[in-house]
Amino acid sequence: MQISHGLRGGRTVVSVHNGATIVTHGRGGYVQRAYVTRGGRAYYSRTFYAGGVYHVGIYRGYGWGGHMYYGFYPGVWYHPGFYGWGWHPWGAPVAWGIGAWGWGGAPWWGFYGGWWNPYPVYAAPYYWLTDYLISQQLQAAYAARADANADAMAADAAASGDSGGGGGDAAPVASGPVALTPEVKEAIAQEVKAQLAAQQTQAADQGDAQAAPAAAAAPATASNTPPPALDPSQRTFVVDTGVTVVANGQECALSSGDVITRLTDTPDADNNVNASVSATKKGDCASGQTVAVKVDDLQEMYNHFAENITNGMGELAKKQGTGGMPAAPDTGTQPGAVPPPQPDTTAAAALQQQQQQADQTESQVKQEAASPGGGTQ
């Protein structure tokens, strides 16, 4: 069992049990298991559980440089035309205000309002998706801060013998936000556009495989394909959760919604690549710093980015043709090569058990450190 704590709070616990990888963080987590193999590619199911709700995703395995990585893979694809519509401009800009987004009055919006401003109008769907993606990451950042504050209060109450019943969850406290520049937003938008163009091609391949599977070319195996996080064309990454990185030999924190630009393509001996901090919030790594970030963390940023694009396309499919947004030519869906798995309904119990084991382990370590002679040889 590996237990790590972020510089700004929050705990992540990882273990492997009976072939399943169990990851807990904050008040949720996921359980990953081997799922199916298609054309030499290994796919895995991830069952996420938080707040009493399950959702499941497909992840493709990539063996590269002696490490395994897992990349998000859509279980259902739209027809190619919808992706093409997504990365081409609309005939005229579309106004889509805060009321249309439904963000007005939301605590996270008030907290981050000075750091990020949505576009006043949208020239293309991929700009709309860019604001959707950023909003999802900032909502996650706000929730993570609230959870970390609540967990810290609970730990302090436990240490002092107080039940903590009167405190409740503490909201994050704003601390001088820094603006997300138009240049950084444009870099994110261009990554979204490139992803949609790639997905248009992939969606066409899904249809071709359905029509004539015998004619499909032999795919690359998991052991000779680098993960998407190391794709030379993929440079801009939006941080998905709290991450500890190293700048000039010193650790610093990145939080959900921060933006980094990958500078190097080849991991070092510690499985790190270099990245530049493009946009950050008060208390995180300074903007402009070069940091060493683990490829595993970079891949998870990519995964959340790709999943949010998929979710955002679902929102576009619902909203196209309404509120002044042009209608899309085709929002039909088609099955992918790998069917979506069923949720692992044992995940909640596995995550709870792991959290309890981590609590016990940390409690034991503290007791040993506090005992006479604790920590000495």
Give the predicted meaning of each segment.
Residues Q2-G176:
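Low-complexity segments
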Residues T21-V23, A42-Y43, V246, K281-A286:
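Short, surface-exposed beta-strand/loop "edge" segments at domain boundaries and coil↔beta transitions
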Residues P177-V243, D265-P267, N271, S287-Q289, ...:
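SH3-family beta-barrel domains
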Residues P227-P228, N248-L254:
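Short, surface-exposed secondary-structure edge patches
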Residues E251-D265:
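Conserved beta-strand/loop element in small beta-rich adapter and peptidoglycan-binding domains
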Residues S256-V259, N274, P329:
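C-terminal assembly and membrane-engagement modules of membrane-active proteins
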Residues N271-T280:
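SH3/SH3-like beta-barrel fold
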Residues G283-V295:
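Mid-chain, structured segments of secreted extracytoplasmic proteins
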